[in-house]
Each structure stands twice: as structure tokens, then as C-alpha cells.
Regions:
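C-terminal substrate-binding subdomain of Rossmann-fold SDR/epimerase-dehydratase oxidoreductases
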Residues: 156, 160-255
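SDR active-site strand-loop-helix element
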Residues: 6, 29, 54-58, 93-99, ...
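Conserved Rossmann-fold NAD(P)-dependent oxidoreductase catalytic core, especially the SDR/UDP-sugar
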Residues: 60, 81-110, 127
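NAD(P)-cofactor binding segment of oxidoreductase domains
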Residues: 66-93, 114, 118-119
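NAD(P)H-binding glycine-rich loop region in Rossmannoid oxidoreductase-like domains
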Residues: 40-75, 100
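N-terminal Rossmann NAD(P)H-binding glycine-rich loop of SDR-like oxidoreductase domains
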Residues: 2-22
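Adenosine-cofactor binding site in Rossmann-like domains, unifying the SAM/SAH pocket
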Residues: 25-44
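NAD(P)-dependent short-chain dehydrogenase/reductase
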Residues: 106-110, 114, 118-166, 171-176, ...
């Protein structure tokens, strides 16, 4: 099976490739080979090529979903429409969505993800896997779970800017969902990549604080509870490692 991953240098794309390259023929072109903002680049890349699955992770604005820069909306839609222009070159498309579709729909990033998901529903064999938060040892050092595991390892206070309910999924479990969609048929058009049980940032910090035989203080920058960032789980009949085991795995790899 031949799979194209767009946005090949990104965190999710690299994680998919590292996990599945032995099972599938995975193509992860750099921007010099496939620039989704340039139709000439797309024409050249797709010439005489066909893929069983395209996993669309390429996106602008993901590092700051509140960014008001309207070019984020423009370029995200340009990339997706350019990809659509080559739909005869692939059988299935898996779009990596975002919780920002639901919780930040008035931002250029959230609005673009919302429009893309609506377009997904217009095509057979197009699907959205909506990610709220994803983590493992390879995520950016500033991300909530990894940053606080590192603080715990260094015996430093953990930091919670503002407590909230938030859905995180361990990267290996996200890969399991992606592979389910790679191989599956008669699939839901969109699913939230979340666990059945909701978790607060405070609860996640408490899990980290129980990783060894000592505890560290937890510092709150704001003691009020913020808006939740969660989705309804789907029943995909997948056995997950789960949030707690994912945190344990990250700790064991970082310590």
C-alpha cells in the first residue's frame, strides 16, 4: 500500500512515518518536492503517481491557533483545494483535523479547519480525524505534558497556566486510529481522537506527580478554570494504551 503524507516535516507526519514505514510504502516529500501552495509543483509531483491513501497533515497556523493573520485561512484552503485537484491520483484521504474547528471557529486557523472538514463530507473516502492534544517524548519541549514531565524529572515545580478539561491522546494511540482508517472500510466521516474519560490539566499533573516516590509542587498562573477543550469519543473497537500509560512511557524515555 502506497501512502502520501503531506507536511512531512511536522510532528504528526514524522511520527506516522516512524511508526508505519515498515508496513507501508510511505512517501513524505519535502516542500522542495511538493509545495501545496504552488499548483505547478503539485502538477509535477503527481504526474504518473498514484497513492492508496493521502494523510493530510500540512497546515499553517497550528503553533498559535489564535493568530489573527488572515493569510493562514487563505493558504490552508489553497493547499487543500490544490490537493483536491489531484483527487484522481489517490483512493482515500485522511485529514488531520483540530479541536480548533469547534472551539476557535472565528480564528483564521480554526475557520480554515472547519471549512476543510465540511469539504471532507462532500467526497467519498475522505475522512477527518480531529485531534485536540497529542503527546509523546518527541513533541515540542514547551508542550504541557512533556514540559511538566521534564520539570518533574528535574525536581522542579510543575506549571499549569489555567486548569481546564482537555483531551490529550498518546501518539501511539493516534497512530492506531490512523492505521484503522488506512485499512478500514465503512468508516465514520469524522471522529474525535480522544479517550472515553475526560481529564483536567490538574488531573494530568497529578498523574505526573505519581511517577516516582517523590512529589513536586504544582504552580497555577491563574486559579480560575478555563473553557473545556474536549470532544465526544467514538467507538472504534481499538485497544488503547491510554493517557496514564502514555505518560509513564514518556517519563521512562525522558528520565
Amino acid at each position: 500500500m502506497k501512502i502520501l503524507i503531506t507536511g512531512g516535516k511536522g510532528y504528526i507526519a514524522k511520527s506516522i512515518n516512524n511508526s508505519l514505514w515498515e508496513k507501508y510504502h510511505i512517501v513524505t516529500p519535502g516542500r522542495d518536492e511538493l509545495d501545496l501552495t504552488d499548483i505547478k509543483s503539485i502538477d509535477k509531483f503527481f504526474e504518473n503517481k498514484h497513492f492508496d491513501v493521502v494523510i493530510h497533515t500540512a497546515i499553517k497556523g497550528a503553533t498559535n491557533v489564535k493568530d489573527p493573520d488572515e493569510t493562514i485561512l487563505f493558504w490552508n484552503l489553497v493547499m487543500f483545494y490544490n490537493l483536491l485537484s489531484k483527487e484522481e491520483h489517490f483512493k482515500k484521504l485522511i485529514n488531520i483535523g483540530s479541536g480548533a474547528e469547534k472551539y476557535s471557529p472565528d480564528t483564521p486557523y480554526g475557520y480554515s479547519k472547519n471549512i476543510i472538514n465540511k469539504l471532507v463530507h462532500k467526497y467519498d473516502n475522505f475522512y477527518t480525524l480531529r485531534v485536540y492534544g497529542v503527546f509523546d517524548e518527541n513533541e515540542n519541549d514547551t508542550r504541557f505534558i512533556k514540559a511538566n514531565i521534564k520539570r518533574y524529572i528535574n525536581n522542579e515545580p510543575m506549571i499549569i497556566h489555567q486548569d481546564r478539561l482537555m483531551d490529550f491522546i498518546y501518539m501511539q494511540d493516534l497512530i492506531s486510529i490512523i492505521e484503522h482508517y488506512i485499512k478500514g472500510e465503512d468508516l465514520e466521516k469524522e471522529v474525535n481522537c480522544v479517550y472515553e474519560d475526560e481529564s483536567s490539566l490538574n488531573y494530568i499533573a497529578s498523574l505526573i506527580n505519581n511517577l516516582s516516590n517523590y512529589k513536586v509542587p504544582i504552580t497555577y498562573n491563574n486559579h480560575h478554570t478555563s473553557e473545556s477543550y474536549i470532544g465526544s469519543p467514538a467507538d472504534l473497537s481499538i485497544t488503547y494504551l491510554g493517557l496514564e500509560q502514555g505518560i509513564i512511557n514518556v517519563y521512562n524515555k525522558l528520565k
